[in-house]
A protein has these predicted regions:
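Acidic, metal-coordinating catalytic segment for phosphate/diphosphate chemistry
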Residues: 2-39
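Residue-level preference for beta-strand/loop junctions
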Residues: 34, 58, 106-108
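Residues that recognize and position ribonucleotide moieties
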Residues: 34, 41, 60, 87, ...
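Residues embedded in well-ordered beta-strands
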Residues: 39-41, 47-49, 111-113, 133
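Conserved Nudix-box catalytic region and its N-terminal flanking loop in Nudix hydrolases
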Residues: 43-83
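Unchanged
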Residues: 67-90, 98-155, 165-166
Length: 166
């Protein structure tokens, strides 16, 4: 019975999360058609940190999010990794700046390469992130978002200073 209740709760949370994210994204696009975000390629012992979002066609991604007004890009990356992945990291370098634009909305993303100083601890009871873990590069989920998969491939090839489409 507990499994049924848990499943119903998770389903309700997923529906609520989808509605909130959709409404938030639409409001953001109207209020501010240009955004700035960060992502992080986080490594530890040859593994890569991925976080799983509650919903979406591609729920696994590199940790990251929006940059707050007046916030330093590297500080935003550190904060996002701590919030989504539950681990402390050190920024090693900037991998590149990326652009994603569609339907009048422009999103710029700075991607940093970081080294983790501890294990991932996914947030408990979080509405957005339901899992965070380190994967060997060949085991990164194929359902990860395409932009994250591209950034991982660029990182593995040793590329730096990129300016590409997300």
């Amino acid at each position: 019975m507990n499994a049924v209740i848990h499943g119903m709760r998770e389903g309700a949370l997923t529906l609520a999360y989808c509605a909130i994210v959709t409404a938030r994204d639409r409001a953001r696009r109207l209020a501010n058609p240009t955004t700035l975000g960060v992502r992080a390629v986080v490594t530890r012992d040859g593994r890569l940190l991925m976080v799983r979002h509650r919903s979406g066609a591609t729920p696994w991604s590199l940790p990251g999010g929006g940059v707050s007004r007046g916030e330093d890009l590297a500080a935003a990356a550190l904060r996002e990794v701590r919030e989504e992945g539950g681990c402390v990291v050190q920024v090693e370098r900037l991998l590149g700046m990326y652009f994603q634009g569609d339907h009048g909305f422009n999103n710029y993303v700075a991607v940093f390469v970081c080294a983790a100083t501890g294990d991932a601890r996914p947030p408990v009871g979080d509405l957005e992130i339901v899992d965070a873990r380190f994967f060997l590069p060949q085991d990164v989920p194929a359902t990860a978002d395409v932009g994250s998969l591209r950034r991982i491939a660029e990182f593995r090839r040793g590329l730096v200073g990129l300016a590409e489409m997300w």
